[in-house]
Amino acid sequence: MLDKRIMMADKQQNNYQLVRNNIDNIFSVSGAADCKTLEGVFASKVEAEKENTEALNKIIRVFRMAGCKESDVYSTASIYSHKLNPTAQTAEGCAQRAIKQEKYTEALAFYDEALQLEEIDSLKYDYAYAKAAILRQLGRYAEARSAAYQAISFNGKEGEPYILIATMYADSNPFGDDKILAKTVYWAAVDKLEKAKSVDPACSEAAQKLISAYRQHYPSKEDVFFKPELKPGTMFHIGGWMNEDVRCRD
């Protein structure tokens, strides 16, 4: 009899949890769940429940499902929850707040923490790519490339990390005053863009636009006359932080 009651209680608890999850899902994906509406509903609740991990995580879940991760309410709930019980999701929320405050070093630290706590590769990809984007903005290109490759290691079917690397290559000049050799970075950039197209058809259009633009800056035939080491078909090494071998081309 006791076992039967326990089984019935467990079943009721499971049913309750299922209903609650369904309510969260419906609310988050419905038209009523725009970010401003969610902020109006949950702003006061976050403060009232700032010591309640379960309540805070429920609020965080609703905001994530509604795509409202830039909301102040979301990041505030994340900060409170992170102090109580750090998770990858709360670390990301803390990173979002740091970014809005332009505290990029803090944001990078939170994304590192999220990467350590997360077990799902698709989410690890998001955190690593976010790191790469921040580092690129800070001009820390070598670190940004490392973070981009880290993102690729978690999801090799995404082209955005390759595009990010390409834009950094195109923005670099490891050759000082040598304006002809400086053009070779565009070969390296296009190589990454072609890779982006090959792994991710969804980014083909964006990659192709950059390819068309970068090709305009390739070394000309006249340039090659003065720099025979750039003869089409030969390999050329680009040093500095890039450290890439590229095939010379027209």
Language model regions located:
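TPR/TPR-like (Sel1-like) alpha-helical repeat modules
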Residues: 1-8, 145, 149-153, 181-205, ...
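Terminal, low-structured helical/coil segments at or just beyond the last alpha-helical repeat
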Residues: 195-250
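Generic helix N-cap/helix-start motif at coil->alpha-helix transitions
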Residues: 1-2, 12-23, 34-38, 46-59, ...
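Solenoid-like repeat scaffolds
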Residues: 43-50, 78-86, 113-121, 150-156
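Structural register within alpha-helical repeat arrays
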Residues: 58-63, 77, 94, 130-131, ...
